[in-house]
Amino acid sequence: MPRSPGTRLKPAKYIPVATAAALLVGSSTLFFVFTCPWLTRAVSPAVPVYNGIIFLFVLANFSMATFMDPGVFPRADEDEDKEDDFRAPLYKNVDVRGIQVRMKWCATCHFYRPPRCSHCSVCDNCVEDFDHHCPWVNNCIGRRNYRYFFLFLLSLSAHMVGVVAFGLVYVLNHAEGLGAAHTTITMAVMCVAGLFFIPVIGLTGFHVVLVTRGRTTNEHVTGKFRGGVNPFTRGCYGNVEHVLCSPLAPRYVVEPPRLPLAARLKPPFLRPELLERAAPLKVKLSDNGLKAGLGRSKSKGSLDRLDEKPLDLGPPLPPKAEAGTFGGDLQTPRPSSAESALSAQRTSPPTPAMYKFRPAFPSGPKAPFCGPGEQVPGPDSLTLGEDSIHSLDFASEPSLDLPDYTPGGLHAAYPPSPPLSAADTFSGALRSLSLKAAGRRGGDHVALQPLRSEGGPPTPHRGIFAPHALPNRNGSLSYDSLLNPGSPGGHTCPAHPSAGVASYRSPYLHPGAVGEPPRPPPRSFSPVLGPRPREPSPVRYDNLSRTIMASIQERKDREERERLLRSQADSLFGDSGVYDAPSSYSLQQASALADGARGPALRYGSRDDLVAGPGFGGARNPALQTSVSSLSSAVSRAPRTSSSSLQADLANNNAPGPRPGSGSHRSPVRQGPPSPPSTPRSPSYAGPKAVAFIHTDLPESPPSLAVQRDHPQLKTPPSKLNGQSPGLARLGPAAGPPGPSASPARHTLVKKVSGVGGTTYEISV
């Protein structure tokens, strides 16, 4: 009567088996003590030997039927067939020797019972080839112990027959002394044996029939094969042989050993300090095989040691270099990658485990601030490490570290710009005067672009992403810091001698322009447009991505182009104006963009194309064409003009008295090499985009005689010339080789008046 571990001991279960054992052993003992001695002397000594052998055989089979495993199937795990527990049908059919046998789902053991298997309600187990649960042996009778139960019945029946028979012999021989003790005890044993003889003999006969027919008690009672064919029968002889002589079926449930494991695990399986407190391993067996679930409970010591372990189990951070030192391999920045850094220090605070994949935060000052009078070190005086370049202090700010673009990309790279000359400085000063005067008179404020002579190399935008235009301490880039740098670079800062400023190379510049030292901005001689400090804009684009910044820049360029076109239209159809042509390109291509990435973005017409057009009556006035062509030749020869003529022209412009030419004319000497604009240009367009027209409304007056003698001008009637306004008719050359004019020369006297704030006005009298 095996019991599963953990089940409680119930005394009521052992009353039948204890009674059966007591009656069996007690009656047999009394028989051997009081009856067998006389039978040995009177009948034969073989009588006690025979009864003794049968009695031992009964006890052996009784013990085997009681304590042997009947063939219990182990229960399924809680999670083994969890889905099948809800979706499985109640029955399944299997084919046994060509006959369909139904299997039922066991809700307790969580599997389909095999054929001839049944769940015992007393033992609460599924037993293979379940016959019945016998209370006299306190065990289920199944495949593994049915043989011993059957032999117990046979031997017990034989023993009871022998006890009753030999006891009857003894009583018949002692009939005159029934009151004697021996006769009374023999009669009591016969009564007990006779009392149990009828059921035992009946039960033995019943099982003999079941064995010969190959059935079990459960199948016979339930009537499974009552009207059909039993697929499990082997014939009469085969069935008896299978029950008595077949090998013992295997056992499916193995109880865990009660003794602790003698073998002790050593490293690397367990740590040495936890061997003493390690819990025993638990091994679970199932019908599907051995399950490798070695569950080990965690002891308090192991949990304490887990608390002592560091939580940061990630890869270690790279070693820190000494502050202010850079490796030998970090001296030259790579020109192919975008270089940007905010701090020259390489030390960073320790990174927590949850932030170990974020960029390091430098602990030193970001970008050193220098006043207007201080000098800031340029990129040529500082060598940056590779890791300092790429470890930006951008936690949530966009990174401007853009890669170089190919010609098919967003923007094209440009060749390095030529060095500035003195003509750039003077031409910039003259344009500053004309721009301020035009702005005072109500004209549109248009950003002046650097003028470039024909045939010269294209000038890239300087000062757009200069070293002094880096983001401030928190790493944000503002609209003003991108377009209006605060302080010139290329100098040293006495306030911060040890800190360096990292340079930023724009993706729109040529790679060859990275290593060039920054050029100082042109000094303007205008008292109005001098350098004045400007507060940065409060609006900042801190958390914008590259795409948004590019769209903002494109919109700014589009607005600039529209403003240029409006200014051009106003100058074409206004009363008076000033025309500054970057080169002698055709006006017909003014609104067309360049096909190549290196071509100019906008092309404006020259003076000869503008005057020779249909609106200017070039076809109807050949003299006007001759005058304008002379101006174009003077413009193309402007870079070769000597500095003496340039200074003379500047002196004439600044003279307080009358000067040659009207206020609407400009000397061709001004068409020199390009100079940087007062307002930075957009990096999206690098061609010679022209500031086409700056118009001023000036009253006209007759010119002086000196102007008549020195510079013969193109005279136009006061009303219109060939249907055009007077301002457009005065587009002839201001200085050039004398030639015949198209109409009588018109002479005006120009006076120079100084206004408020140092502004100089040119008034025609």
UniProtKB/Swiss-Prot annotation:
EC number: 2.3.1.225
Key words, A-Z: Acyltransferase, Golgi apparatus, Lipoprotein, Membrane, Methylation, Mitochondrion, Palmitate, Phosphoprotein, Transferase, Transmembrane, Transmembrane helix
Residue ranges of the region described as Disordered: 290-386, 447-542, 630-747
GO molecular function ontology, one term from the record: palmitoyltransferase activity
Residues with the Omega-N-methylarginine modification: 441
Composition bias, Pro residues: 671-680
Catalytic reactions of this protein: L-cysteinyl-[protein] + hexadecanoyl-CoA = S-hexadecanoyl-L-cysteinyl-[protein] + CoA
Record field: compositional bias (Polar residues): 333-348, 639-655
Annotated active site: 134 (s-palmitoyl cysteine intermediate)
Annotated ranges, domain DHHC: 104-154
Primary localisation category: Golgi
GO aspect biological process, one term: peptidyl-L-cysteine S-palmitoylation
The protein, known as: Palmitoyltransferase ZDHHC8
Species lineage: Eukaryota, Metazoa, Chordata, Craniata, Vertebrata
Gene, per the UniProt record: ZDHHC8
